[in-house]
Amino acid sequence: MAILQSFLLLLSLPFLFTLIYTKKMKESKRNLPPGPAKLPIVGNLHQLQGMVHRCLHELSKKHGPVMHLQLGFVPLVLISSSEAAEEALKTHDIECCTRPNTNAARVFSRNNKNIGLGAYSDEWRELRKVAVREYFSVKKVQSFRYVREEENHLMVKKLRDLALKQSPVDLSKTLFCLAASTVFRPVFGQSFSDNKHFSEEKIEELVFEAQKSLTFKFSDLFPIPGLGWFIGFVSGQHKGLHKVFIEVDNFLNHMIDDHQKQNQPQDRSDIVGSLLDMIHNQEQDKSFKLTIDHLKGITQDIFLAGIDTSAITMIWAMAELVNNPRVMKKVQDEIRSCIGIKKERIEEEDVGKLQYLKLVIKETLRLHPAAPLLLPRETMADIKIQGYDIPRKTLLLVSAWSLGRDPKYWKNPEEFNPERFIDCPVDYKGHSFEFLPFGSGRRFCPGMASAIATIELTLLNLLYFFDWKLPEEMKDMNMEESGDVTIVKKVPLELLPVLYH
């Protein structure tokens, strides 16, 4: 087998060098953005060891806010300034709003039948309309308010018991379970803890394994007929990708089967039930027909992207608050003075009174965007950004992480200081290009309203009912990062809750 692999590699080398030479000749005629020197074949892959968003940030400080790299045979442009981001995501949004055709995108999008990874098309636009109407609209988010309130109440009861025992809490796990619970009931019609097919631990593992599978693989970087497939086959990347996808698909099949066995009447309140009713009752002559694969695509987006991103933001917020006692005291003083000290249960309407809490969340999103490089885009036409040529089929990354730390826009950018947003018009809704935790343009995250509602209410509950401190054996908070598409706190957040009342 090793001899065969070596023989095939030798056969491909002349072809590879011919492609490299041809590509170099074409590039020499274009005004490409600056970037680091590239090695033959691998390009700049050797410079992206470790946390990729940090590697790219350091390179961009040297080469500029519009930077060109080569990953294997795939050209990449990194955007890390507000002006360049506005050109890419607003001026040229229509030319930059598709996704790269990676192995993971093809598999997990079910051939472009979901929103997050699907290519831009008429089908994608129709599917997004359905998803927004059934789950992501402000009206729908408000209709699920009772779920968020009930799940937070259950979380507080469990934390009370632990506080009475003076027992430390793994807040990373607690907040993942809370985020999952607020998704499971509206989407699948059942509690996260009551799932009879998968344990809580298995679902958590599945979410993180799926996120890891969505990263660029070595085989994606050599999109030459046969070569990419060969690399993926020999390395086992294809096998690993399909294994995770099959597990996700099995989970969704179980959820759908449970609904189909219930024989409930129409107008079911959860998303799976509503979409099944739409599939069964849709007009046959419509140009866009919703299918089971579309249903899986929508629910998979919510399941994989909606749980860990909200949990990640809440974890970082609590970590920063414990690290910054001044901010912790100020936000708790606001909460307790506005709400009083005798409330047994927090309601979502209480959030509207709390301006400093909202600033804390903004500052957390600035320093710790859950997806620091957003999701990759691909140019569908030749464009110019900041005067540089960006050819068609170029991978485009926007570093929300770098934008949030740029001293050009933020004073003392590494400091956790919510007051910076007082009387500041900058917001996270996609129109302030120095602050893009949810992206912008046609690929703006549709789950923003749902995520913010969950984050605000959960932090309010944690900060109203409890004081928080490090366990006695811990001297300092470890703030190291870990992850790929999303960036989590490397060491789980363990804190000691102290009952306030």
Curated annotation (Swiss-Prot):
Membrane topology, as annotated: Single-pass membrane protein
UniProt-annotated location(s): Membrane
GO cellular component, one term: membrane
Domain of life: Eukaryota
Segment forming the signal sequence: none
Pfam family, one: p450
Necessary cofactors: heme
Annotated SUPFAM superfamilies: Cytochrome P450
PANTHER family: CYTOCHROME P450 71B11-RELATED (PTHR47956), CYTOCHROME P450 71B25-RELATED (PTHR47956:SF5)
Protein name as it appears in the record: Cytochrome P450 71B25
UniProt organism field: Arabidopsis thaliana (Mouse-ear cress)
